[in-house]
């Protein structure tokens, strides 16, 4: 029927042959599909039959069909016996026939099969796994926006939490329908059984949840061990012993006041600080690990913090004094006397920011000792040979103080933070005191570095 049409085809001069050659040229359908070039022989379709699988393999997938520069024509009466392909620029017009049609696509539904495995899950509405959807990170379970890859699958926080709870609590669900419930963003909470099954089908791993729990437990145990080792390495009992060893007995002072001295308040404070500077070195030697530092670093730390350390001591000693401070010599310095001497502003700061706060929270000796140890171990002091070691010691004191407050004052969860808030005020007041030259006459003509070196080299006196 189509013999005359399909047997011979005339091409323009020079196409597929030698230059200047004209005449009839025929081509094999299979050759045309495989090479796109005309053949020199003139067989009929019956000479070289082409099977249906070969023709479909030439077409391949819809992407191949759309990407090909040729138009493939097949017969709808049965398996096509051949196909004609036209090179670019040449139009082939099929003879009028209702029995010919153009195959331009392949049904996608025939190529994609439902996921094998669990019964009823094949009918669920699975999100697309095309490259575009992966870029958007859609939850593979319900289609909501993904927050990342959880337990091996891109999923939202809701599905992640649902799967984790199911595994950790070893929950068992049942489906009220046919185990094929639709799981999407709006209906993901309707059936927990089908949601959990879909989590498994999409690739969520039970062992990933168990490993995460094990890692969390190991991390918590490690942190607890570090904290315990810090407490053992910097025991609060030794810090308290250091405080008690150098603090004078205040009960022997009685009701002594500034009237017992003819000196002005500034001179009295300087004399008291002079006396306390000797005991300050003894106190530092009793703090755990301070003596393990190099002698040069010990001098640097004491030189950087001695004013704050002394101010903290007499501030805490003065919590029982009304409107004044109690010096280590047993003398009281009243607010009015300080104002008369021209140092009223800094004196007021000591009373309001330190003495009053210590009194309100009833700061004990152990807490005072820890705060002073934190001041002593200052990793920012200039000239330290090993600031990281000093920082490690300070962190140990932090851990010791926090553990102590939690154990001693469990009803005050914010006590540790309140204690640390006194440190900035102490630092600011200490700098202001240096500006007022309070302590510049402490040791006469002896340079403070020389004095500290001599004191630190003196063996610790044990009682």
Curated annotation (Swiss-Prot):
Highest taxon above the source species: Eukaryota
In residue numbers, the region (Modulating) covers 1-138
Q: Where is the composition biased (Polar residues)?
A: 21-33
Disulphide bridges in this chain? none
Query: GO biological process: what's one of them?
Result: nervous system development
Q: What is its main location?
A: nucleus
List locations, semicolon-separated: Nucleus; Cytoplasm
List all Basic and acidic residues biased stretches.
211-222
- Cellular component annotations (GO), alphabetically ordered: cytoplasm; RNA polymerase II transcription regulator complex
Q: Which residues form the NR LBD domain?
A: 231-459
Zinc finger (NR C4-type) in chain:
139-159, 175-199
Q: Which residues bind DNA?
A: 139-204
What modifications follow translation? Answer: Acetylated by EP300.
Q: Does the keyword Cytoplasm apply?
A: yes
The alphabetical list of record keywords is:
Cytoplasm, DNA-binding, Metal-binding, Nucleus, Receptor, Transcription, Transcription regulation, Zinc, Zinc-finger
What segment(s) does the record annotate as region Hinge? 205-230
Show the GO MF annotations: molecular condensate scaffold activity; nuclear receptor activity; nuclear steroid receptor activity; retinoic acid-responsive element binding; zinc ion binding
InterPro entries per UniProt: NHR-like_dom_sf (IPR035500), Nuc_recep-AF1 (IPR021780), Nucl_hrmn_rcpt_lig-bd (IPR000536), Nuclear_hormone_rcpt_NR2 (IPR050274), Nuclear_hrmn_rcpt (IPR001723), Retinoid-X_rcpt/HNF4 (IPR000003), Znf_hrmn_rcpt (IPR001628), Znf_NHR/GATA (IPR013088)
PROSITE patterns attached to this UniProt entry: NR_LBD, NUCLEAR_REC_DBD_1, NUCLEAR_REC_DBD_2
Looking at the keywords, is Acyltransferase present? no
One Pfam match: Hormone_recep
> What does the record's free text say on domains?
Composed of three domains: a modulating N-terminal domain, a DNA-binding domain and a C-terminal ligand-binding domain.
In the record, the note on similarity to other proteins reads: Belongs to the nuclear hormone receptor family. NR2 subfamily.
Q: What does this protein do?
A: Receptor for retinoic acid. Retinoic acid receptors bind as heterodimers to their target response elements in response to their ligands, all-trans or 9-cis retinoic acid, and regulate gene expression in various biological processes. The RAR/RXR heterodimers bind to the retinoic acid response elements (RARE) composed of tandem 5'-AGGTCA-3' sites known as DR1-DR5. The high affinity ligand for RXRs is 9-cis retinoic acid.
Q: Which proteins does it associate with, and in what oligomeric form?
A: Homodimer. Heterodimer with a RAR molecule. Binds DNA preferentially as a RAR/RXR heterodimer. Interacts with RARA.
Q: What is this protein called?
A: Retinoic acid receptor RXR-gamma
Gene name for this UniProt entry: RXRG
């Amino acid at each position: 029927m189509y013999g005359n049409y399909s047997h011979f085809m005339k091409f323009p001069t020079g196409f597929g042959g030698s230059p200047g050659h004209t005449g009839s040229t025929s081509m094999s359908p299979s050759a045309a599909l495989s090479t796109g070039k005309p053949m020199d022989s003139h067989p009929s379709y019956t000479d070289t039959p082409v099977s249906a699988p070969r023709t479909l393999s030439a077409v391949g997938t819809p992407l191949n069909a759309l990407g090909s520069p040729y138009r493939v024509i097949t017969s709808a009466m049965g398996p096509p016996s051949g196909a004609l392909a036209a090179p670019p620029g040449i139009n082939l017009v099929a003879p009028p026939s209702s029995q010919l049609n153009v195959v331009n696509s392949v049904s996608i539904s025939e190529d994609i099969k439902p996921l094998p495995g669990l019964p009823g899950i094949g009918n669920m509405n699975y999100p697309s796994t095309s490259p575009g959807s992966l870029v958007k990170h859609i939850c593979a379970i319900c289609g909501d926006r993904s927050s990342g890859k959880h337990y091996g699958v891109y999923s939202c926080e809701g599905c992640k939490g649902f799967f984790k709870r199911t595994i950790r609590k070893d929950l068992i669900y049942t489906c009220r329908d046919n185990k094929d419930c639709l799981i999407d963003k709006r209906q993901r909470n309707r059936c927990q059984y089908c949601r959990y099954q879909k989590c498994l089908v999409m690739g969520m791993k039970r062992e990933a949840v168990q490993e995460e729990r094990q890692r969390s437990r190991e991390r918590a145990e490690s942190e607890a061990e570090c904290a315990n080792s810090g407490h053992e390495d910097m025991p609060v009992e030794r810090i308290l012993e250091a405080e008690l060893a150098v603090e004078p007995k205040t009960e022997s002072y009685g009701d002594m006041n500034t009237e017992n001295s003819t000196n002005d308040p500034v001179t009295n404070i300087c004399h008291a600080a002079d006396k306390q500077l000797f005991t300050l070195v003894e106190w530092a030697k009793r703090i755990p690990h301070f003596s393990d530092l190099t002698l040069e670093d010990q001098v640097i730390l004491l030189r950087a913090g001695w004013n704050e350390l002394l101010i903290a001591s007499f501030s805490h000693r003065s919590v029982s004094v009304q409107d004044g401070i109690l010096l280590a010599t047993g003398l009281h310095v009243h607010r009015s006397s300080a104002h008369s001497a021209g140092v009223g502003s800094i004196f007021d700061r000591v009373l309001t920011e330190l003495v009053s706060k210590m009194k309100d929270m009833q700061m004990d000796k152990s807490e005072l000792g820890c705060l002073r140890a934190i001041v002593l171990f200052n990793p920012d002091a200039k000239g330290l040979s090993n600031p990281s070691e000093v920082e490690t010691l300070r962190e140990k004191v932090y851990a010791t103080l926090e553990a102590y407050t939690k154990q001693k004052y469990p009803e005050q969860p914010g006590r540790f933070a309140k204690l640390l808030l006194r440190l900035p005020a102490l630092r600011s007041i200490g700098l202001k005191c240096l500006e007022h030259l309070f302590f510049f006459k402490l040791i006469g003509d002896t340079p403070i570095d020389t004095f500290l070196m001599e004191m630190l080299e003196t063996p610790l006196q044990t009682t």
